[in-house]
Amino acid sequence: MYNNLKTGDIIKFGSYEQDNNAGNGKEKIEWLVLKKADNKALLVSKYILDCQPINTGSNKDKQKWETCDLREWLSSTFLNSAFTPEERSSIQLSHVPADKNTENPGDPNLDPGNSTYDRLFLLSMLEVETYFNSYEARRCAGTPYAKSKGLYVAEYDKTTDGELASYWWTRNPAHAMEQTNPFVPPQKTSGMAVVDPAGVMPAYGGLLQQLDTGVRPAMWLCFKD
């Protein structure tokens, strides 16, 4: 059923709570096809499916994708919740390169770490730039469930479908600004790059413990002839 896929198509695969009504069960997840290659396709969720921090604790050493808590959450909690064993067998264990921050590629404090192998991952800044050809195309809205978890929703910026957009994570380390004292200007600290509601990837990202930024899982889905 997937052999005729092309870039820009939307497919349904897996299930996750989305309408914020657990009583009617999980809803099918919609995925945007970013790339087709032989018998597999690179997908990213059409909507922001959840609202999670990069790290649940205060460890700023977990700024890299390979060591962050969100990677573990995607690879365990989300993977097991959203897909059946049969569906999981179709998700490729993929090489996930440690791309540099495209806004500050030479900054030694933004070392992306080592490449990983994951079934589910976040897009890098480079991949966002490669697969989305406009700011409007990068804008993404959250599901009612994600919004119930505290997802920030813009007042004016809308997706191409006319929905109000939100922030979503990439997997690149970034600088973030943190204000711990109202009498002192914000200080630069560790963060992770984001796509903002306008579809821009600003030079300063989100704090690692930030609770209002969304998750758009990505994966390589394999299919049989």
Label every model-predicted segment.
Residues 1-225:
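Collagenous Gly-X-Y triple-helix signature in extracellular proteins
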